[in-house]
Amino acid sequence: MNFVEELRWRGMVHDMMPGTEELLAKEQVTAYVGIDPTADSLHIGHLCGVMILRHFQRCGHKPLALIGGATGMIGDPSGKSAERNLLDEETLRHNQACIKKQLAKFLDFESDAPNRAELVNNYDWMKEFTFLDFAREVGKHITVNYMMAKESVKKRLNGEARDGLSFTEFTYQLLQGYDFLHLYETKGCKLQMGGSDQWGNITTGTELIRRTNGGEAYALTCPLITKADGGKFGKTESGNIWLDPRYTSPYKFYQFWLNVSDADAERYIKIFTSLDKAEIDGLVAEHNEAPHLRVLQKRLAKEVTVMVHSEEDYNAAVDASNILFGNATSDALKKLDEDTLLAVFEGVPQFEISRDALVEGVKAVDLFVDNAAVFASKGEMRKLVQGGGVSLNKEKLAAFDQVITTADLLDEKYLLVQRGKKNYYLIIAK
């Protein structure tokens, strides 16, 4: 499998330094992608870089994932308009351990294969590096003129950012360049890959390698992922879509991919899955024949959810989706954990009632009219119940004066009332 050809048909090549393809064709190459450790989880904005490493390893090359422990203490000005908060070492080490666990779902770190993945942290070689070392070994090789010509620096100096550019952030490209030099000298790493906003920093590294010891190193970047409507990829109203289920439930993760547009689904299934070209072409053709069936979105959501979480989490997410949008049973509803239940019914009207009242038992008509205003009047509720239009926990309410007790609670805390086909209400017993 040819790595560059694989990336090309997937739409994952933005820029590539001349000679890169020839290098990859003649030998097993070691390459790295830098990962910002400012959180203890990756989010889907990291996934393109991670997938590039995954394809790289599948093509027989050796991937390095570089945790920017030192550079994460500073902040990269590329594409940013303000200084970043700096992290302490203990937090960075914790974040690194969490990130490695996530990367292990994509990369082989454990086998004896010569191209097994490695995780490195630039803090390990930068922590003993003095300012005098830096000035002598790095600073003297790169001119200020060269650094000022970088687009990320120009933008910050030309007034796009109110705070200007600190010296710390100005030197970031030299630190990233030194990472490349260090990995070139210690790991034989000849290629750095990243997002297109990293081109300037990566080429500073190739230039530093050339000027320091006459070595040849290469750069490859992928496009920054956008949405077809121009919106920012990977962000929702509630923030990032994280890979860690503590921050984004598998259900919400699955729903994100399921709800992308047709145009985005066709691009994303190439970028964020390992499906081959023939299978993707077949899925696209099938989707185009019947777009309303959302074949692409369903397969995309399945592949990414299984890869990031598990088959079990994927199946649970599908079951949870069917509860809201399909003809699910009360048994399926009872299987939901509390987080998924709340995620599925996020945004529906909620009412609080006293748990003590349920211990003795309460008539449904009193509970849903007097205690929680699901219905405007008892007459309205009686009429809907008689017409079969009211369900409690996905079971039709048999009588409007049916007695409800704590035994009916989901997760010992919730009652789900459905009025008609689409109106849901969540009652919380406290």
Curated annotation (Swiss-Prot):
L-tyrosine binds at residues 32, 172, 176. Belongs to the class-I aminoacyl-tRNA synthetase family. TyrS type 1 subfamily. Signal peptide: none annotated. GO terms for cellular component: cytosol. It catalyses: tRNA(Tyr) + L-tyrosine + ATP = L-tyrosyl-tRNA(Tyr) + AMP + diphosphate + H(+). Residues 362-429 form the S4 RNA-binding domain. ATP binds at residue 235. It is found in: Cytoplasm. Its EC number is 6.1.1.1. A motif ('KMSKS' region) lies at residues 232-236. This is Tyrosine--tRNA ligase. InterPro entries: aa-tRNA-synth_I_CS, aa-tRNA-synth_Ic, Rossmann-like_a/b/a_fold, S4_RNA-bd_sf, SYY-like_C, Tyr-tRNA-ligase, Tyr-tRNA-ligase_bac-type, Tyr-tRNA-ligase_bac_1. A motif ('HIGH' region) lies at residues 37-46. The gene is tyrS. GO terms for biological process: tyrosyl-tRNA aminoacylation. GO terms for molecular function: ATP binding; RNA binding; tyrosine-tRNA ligase activity. Homodimer. It comes from Bacteroides fragilis (strain YCH46). PROSITE patterns: AA_TRNA_LIGASE_I, S4. HAMAP family: Tyr_tRNA_synth_type1. Catalyzes the attachment of tyrosine to tRNA(Tyr) in a two-step reaction: tyrosine is first activated by ATP to form Tyr-AMP and then transferred to the acceptor end of tRNA(Tyr).
